[in-house]
Amino acid sequence: MAFTSLLGSDAERKVAVAEVALRAVLCGLGALAAALVATDTQTRTFFSLQKKATYTDMKAMVLLVAAAAAAAGYSLLQAARCCCCVALLRTSIRPRARLLLAWCVFACDQALAYALLAAVVAALQASVVAKQGLPQLQWMAICALYGAFCRQAGAGVACAVAAAVDAALLAFLSAFNLFRLYGAKATTTT
C-alpha cells in the first residue's frame, strides 16, 4: 500500500503543510524567547553601588535560554527536512526507511517537547519567586526593584510558554505521522 493512499494525497499535503507551519512558528517563538531573555539586563544604583540584573542570575532562565535556542535550531532543521521529504515522497522511498525516519522524528519531538516544557516550568517558578518573593526565606521580590528586567523576562517566558505548547502539538503530529504508518502496514497484511 502506498504512503499516499492511506490518507489521500490532499490530506497528506495538509498534514505536511501543518507540520511545516508548526515548525516555523516554533522556530520563531523559540528564537524570540531566547533573544528576549538572553538580552535582558537592567542596572540600578544603590547608595553609589551599581547592581546589574541579568538572566544569568537565575539558573532557570539560563536553562530556558538554552532550551528555547535548541528548540529554534531543531525546528529549523526539521522544517528543512519536511520540505525535502515532501519532494522525496513523490519518489519511491522504502517503507523501512520511512518508518525509521518517523521513529527518529517522533523520539526527537517528544524529547524536545518534554525538555522545553521542563525549562518553561522552572522559569515560571523562578519568575513567581522573583515577582512575589519568598517571605519564609526572607527573599524579597526583586521585580519591585528591577521592573524593566522583569517585564522583558516575562515577555520571554510568555513566548517560551507558547513555544512549549507548539512543541506539544508537534509531538502529537509526529506521533500521528508515525502510527499511521503502522495502520497502513496492518491494512496490507489483512
Curated annotation (Swiss-Prot):
List all membrane-crossing ranges: 17-37, 60-80, 101-121, 153-173
Compartment(s) of residence: Cell membrane
* Keywords of this entry: Cell membrane, Membrane, Transmembrane, Transmembrane helix
Tell me how this protein sits in the membrane: Multi-pass membrane protein
Q: Name one GO cellular component term.
A: plasma membrane
What's the superkingdom here? Eukaryota
Query: Pfam families under this entry?
Result: CASP_dom (PF04535)
* UniProt cross-references to InterPro entries, sorted A to Z: CASP/CASPL, CASP_dom
Chain ranges sitting on the Cytoplasmic side read 1-16, 81-100, 174-190
Q: Which residues lie on this side of the membrane: Extracellular?
A: 38-59, 122-152
Q: Which PANTHER family match?
A: CASP-LIKE PROTEIN 2B1, CASP-LIKE PROTEIN 4A4
- Assembly description: Homodimer and heterodimers.
- Family in the record: Belongs to the Casparian strip membrane proteins (CASP) family.
Instruction: Please give the name of this protein.
Output: CASP-like protein 2U1
